[in-house]
Amino acid sequence: MMLEHVLVLSAYLFSIGIYGLITSRNMVRALMCLELILNAVNINFVTFSDFFDSRQLKGDIFSIFVIAIAAAEAAIGSAIVSSIYRNRKSTRINQSTLLNK
């Protein structure tokens, strides 16, 4: 696969993630869009690692670290969302004013 094709795919994923993060009103959807952004970054790491220096796996290893951090972020984020849903009965971002009380 050519470098430009993979970079365009990654840019599309990143753009969809940013658009979804900006326009989402649901916390679960915002977490999913954040995962899209992190996956687009991982695609770039692996692509540039393969394209520039295939003998060293620096981009691949860094991508594994980003995947581990994304998994922890998803677990903690879903726990926070479920806790907010139990207390507020809603996962809408504009209705969660936890800092006002």
Curated annotation (Swiss-Prot):
Membrane topology according to the record: Multi-pass membrane protein
Enzyme class per UniProt: translocase
Catalytic reaction annotation: a plastoquinone + NADH + (n+1) H(+)(in) = a plastoquinol + NAD(+) + n H(+)(out); a plastoquinone + NADPH + (n+1) H(+)(in) = a plastoquinol + NADP(+) + n H(+)(out)
GO cellular component: chloroplast thylakoid membrane
Location within or outside the cell: Plastid, Chloroplast thylakoid membrane
Gene3D superfamilies linked to this entry: 1.10.287.3510
TM region positions: 2-22, 32-52, 61-81
Keyword annotations of the record: Chloroplast, Membrane, NAD, NADP, Plastid, Plastoquinone, Quinone, Thylakoid, Translocase, Transmembrane, Transmembrane helix, Transport
GO biological process: ATP synthesis coupled electron transport; photosynthesis, light reaction
Gene Ontology MF term list: oxidoreductase activity, acting on NAD(P)H, quinone or similar compound as acceptor; quinone binding
Pfam families linked: Oxidored_q2
Family label: Belongs to the complex I subunit 4L family.
Oligomer and partners: NDH is composed of at least 16 different subunits, 5 of which are encoded in the nucleus.
Protein's name in the database: NAD(P)H-quinone oxidoreductase subunit 4L, chloroplastic
Organism: Citrus sinensis (Sweet orange)
Gene: ndhE
